[in-house]
């Protein structure tokens, strides 16, 4: 939730569209509106058929209109700061539907601290740190590319309590 506005700002020239859980489509001023009306894919994580169809449709859209897509393949935010294992199916679908798209890994540090105690107190004194890695062409073995992306992202995650 706290990472979406900075990513939108950083990637504004590339018109980012998000793969986001359906719950974020309501209740967050500006962000929810953008997710619902900006062409993002709102997925029901309990319904894989709906999720994959929405991600596939987004992939076709970004390929046709030369836009960008943002997906968080680790799924749910870690409660400890240690990265979770990537859920690769959604990323594979995007890579298949948008073969000309570049993969731009982004490591986000300290996002788990923002909601460590729930919504109150709200991560006072915590700073989100983004590390945007160089783009990777969507060429070759998808499994190897996903492993490379995961390694880049997890390498730069710093867990300090």
Describe the residue ranges of each PLM region.
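A cross-taxonomic marker for long C-terminal extensions/tails that follow the last structured domain
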Residues: 138-161
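A membrane-cytosol interface segment of integral membrane proteins
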Residues: 39-61, 66
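Soluble extracytoplasmic domains of inner/organellar membrane proteins
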Residues: 19, 51, 57-59, 69, ...
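A cross-family acyltransferase "interaction/gating" segment
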Residues: 29-33, 68-70, 76-144
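Catalytic core of membrane glycerolipid acyltransferases/transacylases, capturing the structured
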Residues: 1-47
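Short amphipathic alpha-helical coupling elements at transmembrane boundaries
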Residues: 7, 33, 53-56, 92
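Residue-level signal for alpha-helix termini/capping positions
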Residues: 12, 62-63, 95
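Short amphipathic alpha-helical segments
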Residues: 6-9, 55, 82-85
